[in-house]
Amino acid sequence: LIKITAAVATGLQLLLTLVLWQNYDAGNGGMQFTVRGEWIPSFNISYILGVDGLSLPMAILTALLCFIGIFVSWNINKAVKGYFALFLLLDTGIMGVFLSMDFFLFYIFWEVMLLPMYFLIGMWGGPQREYAAIKFFLYTLFGSVLMLVGILGLYFTCGNTFDIQVLKQVAPEALQGVTWWGMSAIKV
């Protein structure tokens, strides 16, 4: 049942991203299909999702690869429910990273994405999966801390907001570059 649920969920996600692509106005540019809700108003944290010309293809590719990934993983026999639950949680985290328009929400989705990856590597990985999972954890922990410092730096120096659209307008050009490189350090 969990395999069918995962296949249906990722199939619906793929279908919805293709509908977004069909209805996306490329001539308009900017963010479209925006969903906004106040989340933690005392810290100016909002739940903001949307797509633009860069995030929409990434969302479509994520949906397609996750849909294919379910069927590639169909013959998993070890802890099947746990595997597919972690796979769907990973899918949710990746999709949230591409759709979030609030840095706090982005960071939450980023961490949501990393946890299932750690367990998927550690439990269903190859012969050296424990070593790989620990190494993955240490690298991503270091990168996540650097990214959090960059996000908090933006928050405290640019008007106490995590809203990416607002930050694009108020953040000084130099600060944007420093923050970008700081957040890109997670790739190293």
Range-by-range predicted roles:
Residues 1, 82-89, 93-188:
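Alpha-helical multi-pass transmembrane bundles of energy-transducing inner-membrane proteins
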Residues 1-85, 157-182:
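Transmembrane helix-loop-helix hairpins at membrane boundaries of multipass inner-membrane proteins
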